Every structure is written in C-alpha cells, then in structure tokens.
C-alpha cells in the first residue's frame, strides 16, 4: 500500500553506502523521488491499523524494495509468499521484474492482513485516500515465489 512503484530508488541503499564523487550525479535514478505528504498519510494509516488485530505483519519497502520486505516478513513469520508482480501498482509502464523487486520507497508498505479482515484494512486505507492492492498471498511452504 502507498505510492506506486517507479524506477526511481532502484539500488538506492547501495547508492547511500557509496562515497559521493563527481560521478555521483550519474547515479541520480537511484535516489527515490520522495513524497512527504504521502508518507505522512501512510504513517497515520499504518498506526491506525497497528492498533487493531486486522494486520498480521507490516514491513516498509525501503532498502531492496519488495524482495527484501517479503524475505524479512517470511523469515519473521516462518512462512513463504507468492507474489504476482503484474499486480504491483506501477508509476511507469514496462518495468522489468528486477526493477519492481528492487525499487525502494519510504511511501510503500507490505502488509499481511488477518484472514477475513481484508475489507477492514481496505477501509482504513480508503479513509486516508491511499491505494492498497493485493499482490500475493502467504504460504506455508517457506518459499518466496515471484511470478
């Protein structure tokens, strides 16, 4: 939920770890295009949901984007996930799978809703005028699958 995925922010964590040089301007696409207002709305919505039991887990899509957030959540929850990359909301057309997986943004969160409470989660995000999309499901096989 939150902002749509774009090509900005890809490998941003790697960029942030490098020394800044005269050539760093060539790496500007690695820098995320921030949206502080969207981030504030997302913060409010996630705090509201965190106070309920409608959510099983939440993870930001900061460093390494979807690939890292799904891995972290799956590990913490001792579960797996199946993620349909075609369902990931995109700001730009024709993004490659690796771009979708590695795009980093502070205005996006991965959330696992409690089974049967999905509409409640959607209602909170609608209240805050934030997009929310189902991009996959939790599995019990311990594997991460992206297709």
Give residue spans per PLM region.
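Glycine/proline-enriched, intrinsically flexible loops and inter-domain linkers
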Residues: 1-147
């Amino acid at each position: 939920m939150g902002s749509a995925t774009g090509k900005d922010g890809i490998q941003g964590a790697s960029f942030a770890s490098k020394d800044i040089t005269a050539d760093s301007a060539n790496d500007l696409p690695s820098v995320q295009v921030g949206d502080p207002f969207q981030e504030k709305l997302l913060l409010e919505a996630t705090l509201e949901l965190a106070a309920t039991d409608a959510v099983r887990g939440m993870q930001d899509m900061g460093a390494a984007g979807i690939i890292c957030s799904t891995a972290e959540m799956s590990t913490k929850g001792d579960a797996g996930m199946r993620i349909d990359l075609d369902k990931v909301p995109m700001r730009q057309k024709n993004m490659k799978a690796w771009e979708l997986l590695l795009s980093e943004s502070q205005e996006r969160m991965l959330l696992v809703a409690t089974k049967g409470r999905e509409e409640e989660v959607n209602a909170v995000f609608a209240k805050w005028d934030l997009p929310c999309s189902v991009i996959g499901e939790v599995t019990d096989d311990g594997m991460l699958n992206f297709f």
